[in-house]
Amino acid sequence: MSPGGKFDFDDGGCYVGGWEAGRAHGYGVCTGPGAQGEYSGCWAHGFESLGVFTGPGGHSYQGHWQQGKREGLGVERKSRWTYRGEWLGGLKGRSGVWESVSGLRYAGLWKDGFQDGYGTETYSDGGTYQGQWQAGKRHGYGVRQSVPYHQAALLRSPRRTSLDSGHSDPPTPPPPLPLPGDEGGSPASGSRGGFVLAGPGDADGASSRKRTPAAGGFFRRSLLLSGLRAGGRRSSLGSKRGSLRSEVSSEVGSTGPPGSEASGPPIPAPPALIEGSATEVYAGEWRADRRSGYGVSQRSNGLRYEGEWLGNRRHGYGRTTRPDGSREEGKYKRNRLVHGGRVRSLLPLALRRGKVKEKVDRAVEGARRAVSAARQRQEIAAARAADALLKAVAASSVAEKAVEAARMAKLIAQDLQPMLEAPGRRPRQDSGGSDTEPLDEDSPGVYENGLTPSEGSPELPSSPASSHQPWRAPACRSPLPPGGNWGPFSSPKAWPEEWGGPGEQAEELAGYEAEDEAGVQGPGPRDGSPLLGGCSDSSGSLREEEGEDEESLPQLRAPGGSESEPVTTPVLRGLSSRGPDAGCLTEEVEEPAPTERPAQPGAANPLVVGAVALLDLSLAFLFSQLLT
């Protein structure tokens, strides 16, 4: 495991956890300034890799990271929504599922944090949109399917007729009827999600209050009449304000003859009702999250519009087919027919319409092509949504691993924190920078400076000792009596086999101890017995060749002046490399008589003095015998 460490940032943040090569590595916990935000989990060379980030507002991210950004699979949770899926460059993408607490859900493709490509959006009331998206909005071709009217959510915004997360509520009862003269909003005001078709002859509330000149100089739908309408109420479609209008007033702007309209007060017409089980489907083009372009909207009761759209309204050339089979076609403006009219007789209409009919036919043909394209995009969107659901499942699995990594990181941080804060007791580090367990004291078997016993063995002198300092075996090599003090080294019984331990050299060691007990360590050789010197565990010897000159102990002449006999001394011929217990191989070599040297004061050998005294006594005895 990587060694632990702690790093305090200048802004008040702090990191506690694994540390390697001067960077966060392994498990660790990092907090922001003032504990605002926290990441806990795995780190890789200074960057987050797998873990959990918790923001100051309570939102969290669990998943993969790369180069300090969210990358791979992960789950983001906020107070009102959750995203599960892929991440790219710190943003949502490429595939994932977004869900809101209200029930809204999007499954599909993402780009730069927004819905982009193909996807399926399911609304809180159960309605759906399947098709193309761009920069988080419905854009391209798609299909919007509503739920039954009594289940559809009531829209708040007067501009939104397609439900989304920011402008949706669970289905609620219809709003109270407006007061007479109350200005109606757009066609979507008070409408249900997914329902945009207007009833027969309905016109936009705002535009219907404009004065329109008619034949005979009368003002249909004047402001005065708008304020005094007795039947001022919203139509059952919920998209426009109902009014008292005659059959003729529904054909405002038509190409019919001037005398075809009544000049008296308008006759109220019963509003059309929408069944609670009615549904509505739109298939076609979308622009900036609204129905715009060519498309077809059809209600389950038979009401149908084919043609051009703009901002969720019928705008341009198109055709409306009513449930009873009758049709009206022409040019629409903000849901209001301004050129054209009802189709009563095909022959008179064909003579009057001219170019309007041609434009309507082109618009209807374009709307039908748009429906075909929208259905194809719908299938692609469904496939992308299925892939996104699989990515969401994989992201949830990664999130579980991230939570486990965060738990491990917090445990390690808790273990490291007391040790890092304790004064005077920090973890040891080896030469490579890795931490080791702190030791209260060194083990007695550990040698100083990192030397092993074989490396720390003292070397024998490379030259003979001078007369002022006679050579003697090093103390660490001399055999000691049983129970003796071995100094900084352990007993020979604990040495391993390669050092000549007791397993192989027990007999030789016993021989040394026996000689020590018998007092063999005399000051010099006696009766030609070899002198055992220090032995080295190296492969060399003190002398490799015979006949090499070597200084010996000073010799004294007898009073008669005769030269002394050659002295036989042992010379080391070879050394065993098995260890300090191994014996030395010796060979007796005859050495030439040493040259005379003046006796050094204080350097006489007691044996020599005794021999001289014995010689004097012998000479005295001989002289006494001769005299007698």
UniProtKB/Swiss-Prot annotation:
**Per the annotation, which location comes first and is thus the protein's main one?**
membrane
Q: Name one Pfam family in it.
A: MORN
User: What membrane topology does the UniProt entry give?
Assistant: Peripheral membrane protein; Single-pass type IV membrane protein
Q: Name one GO cellular component term.
A: smooth endoplasmic reticulum
User: SMART domains, per this entry?
Assistant: MORN
Entry's localization field: Cell membrane; Endoplasmic reticulum membrane
Chain ranges passing through the membrane: 607-628
Which organs or tissues contain this protein? Answer: Specifically expressed in brain. Highest levels in the olfactory tubercle, caudate putamen, nucleus accumbens, hippocampal formation, piriform cortex and cerebellar cortex. Expressed in disctete neurons sites. In hippocampal formation, expressed in dendrites of hippocampal pyramidal and denate granule cells. In cerebellum, it is highly expressed in Purkinje cells, while it is weakly expressed in granular cells.
User: MORN repeat ranges?
Assistant: 15-37, 39-60, 61-82, 83-105, 106-128, 129-151, 282-304, 305-327
Q: Which residues lie on this side of the membrane: Cytoplasmic?
A: 1-606
Q: Where is this region: Disordered?
A: 158-214, 231-276, 418-603
Q: List cystine links.
A: none
Family annotation (SUPFAM superfamilies): Histone H3 K4-specific methyltransferase SET7/9 N-terminal domain
Bias class Pro residues marks the residues at: 170-179
Composition bias, Low complexity: 231-241, 453-467, 528-541
What domain of life?
A: Eukaryota
- Phenotype seen when the gene is deleted: Jph3 and Jph4 double null mutants exhibit atypical depolarizing responses, irregular cerebellar plasticity due to abolished crosstalk in Purkinje cells. There is hyperphosphorylation of PRKCG and mild impairment of synaptic maturation. Exploratory activity, hippocampal plasticity and memory are impaired and there is abnormal foot-clasping reflex.
User: What Gene Ontology biological process does one annotation of this record name?
Assistant: regulation of cytokine production
Q: What does this protein do?
A: Junctophilins contribute to the formation of junctional membrane complexes (JMCs) which link the plasma membrane with the endoplasmic or sarcoplasmic reticulum in excitable cells. Provides a structural foundation for functional cross-talk between the cell surface and intracellular calcium release channels. JPH4 is brain-specific and appears to have an active role in certain neurons involved in motor coordination and memory.
Family in the record: Belongs to the junctophilin family.
Question: Could you tell me which PANTHER family the record lists for this protein?
Answer: GH28348P, JUNCTOPHILIN-4
Q: What name does UniProt use for this protein?
A: Junctophilin-4
